[in-house]
């Protein structure tokens, strides 16, 4: 499958696919003319990359997860779920503040919804 076909299939831009290749995250085979080609194994790897990106994993961590058979995926996923849960709670707090402001039609002096210290602390500890 060409890079253009892979882009259409996945909805990922050609530029992103080229970037993943450059990083060594998604190496492509090359034709004699230098065109990138992806086989089924590469597309499966791309599917995993996209999953981990949706879960907000950094690209360097995704490469480690995919390239190291001894990497503890369960632990990484558990930590990422915890981080996403904290972010979800933060967003829910912001939504509630917006609803409160909308209903009251006036300003309130609340700042706890802007506090990301729990997220920052968890991110620091998880590394």
Language-model segments: residues:
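Short, charged amphipathic alpha-helical surface segments
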Residues: 50, 62-124
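Basic helix-turn-helix/winged-helix DNA-binding cores
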Residues: 1-67
């Amino acid at each position: 499958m060409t890079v253009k076909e892979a882009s259409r299939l996945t909805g990922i831009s050609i530029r992103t696919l080229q970037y993943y290749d450059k990083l060594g995250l998604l190496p492509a085979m090359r034709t004699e003319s230098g065109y990138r080609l992806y086989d089924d194994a590469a597309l499966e790897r791309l599917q995993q990359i996209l999953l981990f990106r949706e879960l907000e994993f950094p690209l360097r961590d995704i490469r480690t997860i995919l390239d190291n058979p001894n990497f503890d995926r369960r632990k990484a996923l558990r930590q990422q779920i915890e981080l996403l849960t904290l972010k979800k709670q933060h967003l829910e707090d912001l939504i509630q503040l917006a609803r409160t402001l909308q209903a009251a039609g006036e300003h309130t002096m609340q700042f706890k919804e802007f506090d990301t210290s729990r997220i920052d602390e968890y991110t620091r500890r998880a590394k």
